[in-house]
UniProtKB/Swiss-Prot annotation:
It comes from Mus musculus. Residues 264-287, 631-654 dip into the membrane without crossing it. Intracellular channel initially characterized as a non-selective Ca(2+)-permeable channel activated by NAADP (nicotinic acid adenine dinucleotide phosphate), it is also a voltage-gated highly-selective Na(+) channel activated directly by PI(3,5)P2 (phosphatidylinositol 3,5-bisphosphate) that senses pH changes and confers electrical excitability to organelles. Localizes to the early and recycling endosomes membranes where it plays a role in the uptake and processing of proteins and regulates organellar membrane excitability, membrane trafficking and pH homeostasis. Residues 20-65, 785-817 are annotated as: Disordered. The gene is Tpcn1. This is Two pore calcium channel protein 1. Residues 1-113, 159-172, 222-235, 320-445, 502-504, 551-569, 693-817 are cytoplasmic.
Length: 817
């Protein structure tokens, strides 16, 4: 098998002999010992880890090198399971399961999952009721659906082969997916046989295929947090509905005697209109009939909105926010301890019989070939040195606990010179040195802030002076040329003073470069009268964002916003999955119901009215336009659901559908509002939690520490480099590894250096911030976790090595979960 070329999928079954030969034991750079029986399963914090090789009581049935290769691979699997938060009971139990595991955990399989799920979702564009231009014959879309479902069957078969039947049926999400698959399969066959579509509400369940994809892990986490937040949410929601019903009964008795008040004529109307009033969509319309009869009736509505909208709704957000904080902290704790357990298992597999107290470099290198296949030999050695805080030949378990953080570093040689222009002739050096001092000075930075502020005011004044949308001037404004020239000079001065590499390493500099480049393109569009590209000119105000760097609070807001973007994307996708499910249900029940003049007998008839009449010689059309908000196809349904999410006049759509169907249709719209309210509340709570967390961390840390990433500096001596190079030459390492090591050696010899310094960099993650925020509690978590492992061992939850097993199999992995 060829080596995988992606760090996200580091696990491979065998190594390509032409590219990466195994590194069996030798006497160089950390002499290798025989792996301990059953995969070196020493008691590491009271946890024993079986291996993929033979049982504990039987001698290894394969060469020592093969035993170590299997240990390296299984240790890498444990690390991957810890990183992905995969439960250890899904660990492959034999060679057959291992092959399936490796097939399931690669990007080809992930892409197959994703594309199949997208195909099933996109079929709703072609199935009845279809988008007119995309409509397909029943035979075609049913065949495509069966093909996609067969691919899902293949995916589940591979997971069954990996997990085994007992574990497969214990996996709840997989069983839900299997159940939906069976229902979808039966329906697709029925449609294909009948050659016509029927009511298929179960299509709303297709989202499970997308949610189960590896690439949609963020969506699964969001759904899990939504379900975890439901208990307190439901408590407050029941309180809200309780007060709503009390006020509905009170309103019915107070206002039903008014014949001109349609809002409280029945108890059902009272409940529905007070529910709509909670969203303020029908206020003050709902109050006016009773208010016209008795001005004191406004007290009823004021008290209702004060309790329901301003107190209970905000209480709902507060409760969800508090629950969300607890969930985030518990999630961090669980993942931290899960990773710690995975590291303990991996360490046990890498410890040898003769040296159980640590991991030699050779063992570590064998692990990294499976865990990080794209990592070069030089980077592996630097990673080993960065982990080895005790500066001993062996890597202790305490050092190995940092494997996840250190393995993510990107290593580059530290430049010997401070600036890019240090080796230039003296005259040029002095010029560029002066430019460097200038662009790094506070005066230069504040001058540019002043220019940006003046530019913003100028753009605002120009915009106020424009009339009738006539902003496509035939002439280039002189102010445009002046400010663009200043920005261009700033750009060239920074590139000259800092150097291209250092300049482009800053996110703000990249932003400045992008905005300046767009401004230049806008100048070309104006000069050449390229009307289709005039929109580029509108991007000029983006320069004003640079002013956010002036104030620390603004920087925190922007940093939080950028940190939230990936998570917000997953939250948006989560909301879209709910949209899809409700859109399918809406199409099945309300398709073709909303048409022009459809609701003439309802209270919202004007919103759906379409009248064509002639006044003199002109034909006048009066349209209510709300008939466009329908469920005739999936695209219209998404637009309609978004309008319902905004809640402005959403009751008009609800009443229009109700007038054409039944009063029970209101349950669909009310349920959708409650579901979107849950998701939106979670989104708001997430934003609040992230911002508060960032602000609290900023108070505890230096500002520069927050803004900068993580940097580790390590020195590699010439002797160490020669030893690593000799190791790879003797053991027939990959040609690329040897070449890179030789390049490093030649660079040392060129500059007559005995050592070279390397910098390992990575961005600071939420996990890093959490480690510092909770550092006082983390040690208590570790001690509690160790006690739990000890208790589980005493209770016999971690059995001893199994009896002799056939070659190629191993005992079930018993781990602490």
């Amino acid at each position: 098998m060829a080596v995988s070329l992606d760090d996200d999928v580091p696990l491979i079954l065998t190594l390509d002999e032409a590219e990466s030969a195994p590194l069996p034991p030798s006497n160089s750079l950390g002499q290798e010992q025989l792996p301990s029986k059953n995969g070196g399963s020493h008691s590491i914090h009271n946890s024993q880890v079986p291996s993929l090789v033979s049982g504990a009581d039987s001698p290894p049935s394969s060469p020592t090198g093969h035993n170590w290769e299997m240990n390296y691979q299984e240790a890498a699997i444990y690390l991957q399971e810890g990183q992905n938060n995969d439960k250890f009971f899904t660990h492959p139990k034999d060679a057959r399961a291992l092959a399936a595991y490796l097939f399931v955990h690669n990007h080809f399989f992930y892409m197959m999952e994703l594309l199949t799920a997208l195909l099933l979702l996109l079929l709703s564009l072609c199935e009845s009721p279809a988008v007119p231009v995309l409509k397909l014959h029943t035979y075609v879309h049913a065949t495509l659906e069966l093909f996609a479902l067969m691919v899902v069957v293949f995916e589940l078969c591979m997971k069954l082969r990996w997990l085994g039947f007992h574990t497969f049926v214990r996996h709840k999400r997989t069983m839900v997916k299997t159940s939906v698959l069976v229902v979808q399969f039966i329906e697709a066959i029925v449609v294909l046989v009948r050659q016509t579509s029927h009511v298929r509400v179960t299509r709303a369940l297709r989202c499970i295929f997308l949610v189960d994809c590896r690439y949609c892990g963020g969506v699964r986490r969001n759904l899990r947090q939504i379900f975890q937040s439901l208990p307190p949410f439901m408590d407050i929601l029941l309180l809200l509905l309780f007060f709503m019903i009390i006020f509905a009964i009170l309103g019915f008795y107070l206002f039903s005697t008014n014949p001109s008040d349609p809002y409280f004529s029945t108890l059902e109307n009272s409940i529905v209109n007070l529910f709509v009033l909670l969203t303020t969509a029908n206020f003050p319309d709902v109050m006016m009939p009773s208010y016209s009869r008795n001005p004191w009736s406004c007290v009823f509505f004021i008290v209702y909105l004060s309790i329901e909208l301003y107190f209970i709704m905000n209480l709902l957000l507060a409760v969800v926010f508090d629950t969300f904080n607890d969930i985030e902290k518990h999630k961090f704790k669980s993942l931290l301890l899960h990773k710690r357990t995975a590291i303990q298992h991996a360490y046990g597999l890498l410890a040898s019989q003769r040296r159980p107290a640590g991991i030699s470099y050779r063992q570590f290198e064998g692990l990294m070939r499976f865990y990080k296949p794209r990592m070069s030999a030089r980077e592996r050695f630097l990673t080993f040195k960065a982990l080895n805080q005790s500066n001993t030949p062996l890597l202790s378990l305490k050092d190995f606990y940092d494997i996840y953080e250190v393995a993510a570093l990107q290593w580059k040689a530290k430049r010997n010179r401070q600036h890019w222009f240090d080796e230039l002739p003296r005259t040029a050096f002095l010029i560029f040195k002066g430019i460097n001092i200038l662009v790094n000075s506070k005066a230069f930075q504040y001058f540019m802030y002043l220019v940006v502020a003046v530019n913003g005011v100028w753009i605002l004044v120009e915009t106020f002076m424009l009339k009738g949308g006539n902003f496509t001037s035939k002439h280039v404004p002189w102010s445009y040329l002046v400010f663009l020239t200043i920005y261009g000079v700033e750009l060239f001065m920074k590139v000259a003073g800092l150097g291209p590499v250092e300049y482009l390493s800053s996110g703000w500099n990249l932003f400045d470069f992008s905005v300046t480049a767009f401004a230049f393109l806008g100048l070309l569009a104006l000069t050449l009268n390229m009307e289709p590209f005039y929109f580029i000119v509108v991007l000029r105000p983006l320069q004003l964002l640079r002013l956010f760097k002036l104030k620390k609070r603004y920087r925190n807001v922007l940093d939080t916003m950028f940190e939230l973007l990936p998570r917000m994307a997953s939250l948006g996708l989560t909301l879209l999955t709910f949209y899809y499910s409700f859109a399918i249900v809406g199409m099945e029940f309300f398709n073709g119901r909303l048409t022009p003049n459809c609701c003439n007998t309802s209270t919202v008839a004007d919103a759906y009215r379409f009248i064509n009449h002639t006044v003199g010689n002109k034909t006048k059309v009066e349209e209510g336009y709300y008939y466009l908000n329908n469920f005739d196809n999936i695209l219209n349904s998404f637009v309609t659901l978004f309008e319902l999410t905004v809640v402005n006049n959403w009751y008009i759509i609800m009443e229009g559908v109700t007038s054409q169907t039944s009063h029970w249709s209101r349950l669909y719209f009310m349920t959708f509002y409650i579901v979107t309210m849950v998701v939106m509340t979670i989104i708001v709570a997430f934003i609040l939690e992230a911002f508060v967390f960032r602000m609290n961390y900023s108070r505890k840390s230096q500002d520069s520490e927050v803004d900068s990433g993580i940097v580790i500096e390590k020195e590699m001596s010439k002797e160490e480099l020669m030893a690593v190079l000799e190791l790879y030459r003797e053991e027939r390492g990959t040609s690329s590894d040897v070449t890179r090591l030789l390049d490093t050696l030649s660079q040392m010899e060129k500059y007559q250096q005995n050592s070279m310094v390397f910098l390992g960099r990575r961005s600071r993650t939420k996990s890093d911030l959490s480690l510092k925020m909770y550092q006082e509690e983390i040690q208590e978590w570790y001690e509690e976790h160790a006690r739990e492992q000890e208790q589980q061992k005493l209770r016999g939850s971690v059995p001893g090595p199994a009896a002799q097993q056939p070659p190629g199999s191993r005992q079930r992995s018993q781990t602490v979960t």
